[in-house]
């Protein structure tokens, strides 16, 4: 695995104030600019001899509407003693990828300065304006060196942005570097079968293991409708036979920053819809960060459509049983008006337009 940012942190002068920051999930917000740190990719250069670093992969973003659904904005802080912290983001951490070099925090009360020390150098992280984008990036040069660690929760939530709407619901693929629990009303599935024409999915529990791409039936069109609870650990196990692959980054910073991107090839299919039905379809360009996709054979259709065949939640019911069911096996109350979509009625597939 490539080094995530052997960042940063070189120094020399010891700072006296002890940082009191509990282990947990945070977003890191600059107190001067109001921008949040977002990790676009893990490409960072460090020159230990001079103490200079290139932190261009760590961009700063103003809009909470952007960061609320961007896993690159979520950091798990774990104290290592002596004001040192390991910072976990996406699929790795600073400490595990930098030979044990950890950043330190200098407490100012409600905010902190993030610094490091190496071979006589002390470097503070600063938020520097980017004139080209109107946003910013993290650097060890600059004056905006005070940061607020905002705990994840409440208004500072993590929500999933839909990719498509189909069969009467909003849907998204999603992969997190941390285990998480679905919000009420959401359901997760993994793809357990793929043919040239269709795919089948199987329902999972509400706790999803880390680093597992899944397909999620959402509550609504906004990330605020689709909140999840992040966890440092979980007893949930990875499903056997998951056919999905996942992405971590979709950096647009150019050069080697884009080495970790996944570009759509002819065999790849990303989540979409076909004729109102849930499908994996041909895509183009770079697949978005923290999403899932499947691979298809050279003879496969452009749109591989969801099929009721092989869905565990439906297989558990006798197809001759009377009643109306959704494609995920949920029985619709008798007399309820059906939204447009595909249903199983008395064992037969029906389409409501």
Across the structure, where does each feature detected by a protein language model lie?
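A short, polar beta-strand/turn micro-motif
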Residues: 21, 148-182, 205-311, 353
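Short, flexible beta-strand-to-coil junctions
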Residues: 29-34, 41, 81, 89-93, ...
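Extracellular glycan-recognition/adhesion modules and their associated mucin-like linkers
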Residues: 20-49, 63-131, 140-156
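Self-processing/autoproteolytic domain segments and adjacent N-terminal interaction modules in large
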Residues: 54, 59-61, 65-67, 72, ...
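Hydrophobic h-region of N-terminal signal peptides that target proteins for export
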Residues: 9-18
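C-terminal outer-membrane/trafficking sorting elements
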Residues: 15, 308-353
